[in-house]
């Protein structure tokens, strides 16, 4: 007589997804950070879009727009805190995902590792652009902190920083 979990049509689906899942037996919680990265990225995009609907980047009104988001927009305070803390969680998951790959020797899979490195550089470039977008996400302070190491390059450091910033548009509390 066959087991009901393998013969019943509905229970068979649950069995194949949870019980008899064809996965290695040594998978631990270290292997879920890729999925958490996707969740964090989705949360960042959604909350960022909703926050951008109410944010103004002008120096005179930026603080008031953030106050408006927190006080007047339904759950605006929650959107703001989810967006701020979601960025930190995203990078924590990213570094743990990379650490897991280093620990388990995933760098031996050259193609996969190279794609991961390209994605890491793309994430870092996107984070930089999130700080210094011309429509006002951050400020001269954010651009300076991120590009400070580049300014130490002899002879070309100062010009390189100015080029990466996009000229001399970085000069106020918000970029407008």
Swiss-Prot record:
Sites where the protein binds heme b b562: 83
The keyword Mitochondrion is assigned to this record: yes
Short name of any one Pfam family annotated for the protein: Cytochrome_B
Disulfide topology: none
Highest taxon in the source lineage: Eukaryota
One Gene Ontology term from the biological process aspect of the record: mitochondrial electron transport, ubiquinol to cytochrome c
UniProt main location, coarse: mitochondrion
Record's keyword annotation contains Metal-binding: yes
Topological category with respect to the lipid bilayer: Multi-pass membrane protein
Keyword annotations: Electron transport, Heme, Iron, Membrane, Metal-binding, Mitochondrion, Mitochondrion inner membrane, Respiratory chain, Transmembrane, Transmembrane helix, Transport, Ubiquinone
Cofactor: heme b
Subcellular location(s) of the protein: Mitochondrion inner membrane
Free-text cofactor note: Binds 2 heme b groups non-covalently.
Protein residues bound to heme b b566: 97
Role this protein plays: Component of the ubiquinol-cytochrome c reductase complex (complex III or cytochrome b-c1 complex) that is part of the mitochondrial respiratory chain. The b-c1 complex mediates electron transfer from ubiquinol to cytochrome c. Contributes to the generation of a proton gradient across the mitochondrial membrane that is then used for ATP synthesis.
Family in the record: Belongs to the cytochrome b family.
Further facts: Heme 1 (or BL or b562) is low-potential and absorbs at about 562 nm, and heme 2 (or BH or b566) is high-potential and absorbs at about 566 nm.
Subunit structure: The cytochrome bc1 complex contains 11 subunits: 3 respiratory subunits (MT-CYB, CYC1 and UQCRFS1), 2 core proteins (UQCRC1 and UQCRC2) and 6 low-molecular weight proteins (UQCRH/QCR6, UQCRB/QCR7, UQCRQ/QCR8, UQCR10/QCR9, UQCR11/QCR10 and a cleavage product of UQCRFS1). This cytochrome bc1 complex then forms a dimer.
Protein name: Cytochrome b
Organism of provenance: Eumops perotis (Western bonneted bat)
């Amino acid at each position: 007589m066959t087991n009901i979990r393998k013969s019943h049509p509905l229970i068979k689906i649950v069995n194949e997804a949870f019980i008899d899942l064809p996965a290695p037996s040594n998978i631990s919680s270290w292997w879920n950070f890729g999925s958490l990265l996707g969740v964090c990225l989705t949360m960042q995009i959604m909350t960022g879009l909703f926050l951008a609907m109410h944010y103004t980047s002008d120096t005179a009104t930026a603080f008031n727009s953030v106050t408006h988001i927190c006080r007047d927009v339904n759950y605006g305070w929650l959107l703001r805190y989810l967006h701020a803390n979601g960025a930190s969680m995203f990078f924590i998951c990213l570094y743990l995902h990379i650490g897991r790959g280093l620990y388990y020797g995933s760098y031996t899979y050259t193609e996969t590792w190279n794609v991961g490195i390209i994605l890491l550089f793309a994430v870092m470039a996107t984070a930089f652009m999130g700080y210094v977008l011309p429509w006002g996400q951050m400020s001269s302070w954010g651009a300076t902190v991120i590009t400070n190491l580049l300014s130490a390059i002899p002879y070309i450091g100062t010009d390189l920083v100015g080029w990466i910033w996009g000229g001399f548009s970085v000069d106020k509390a918000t970029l407008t």
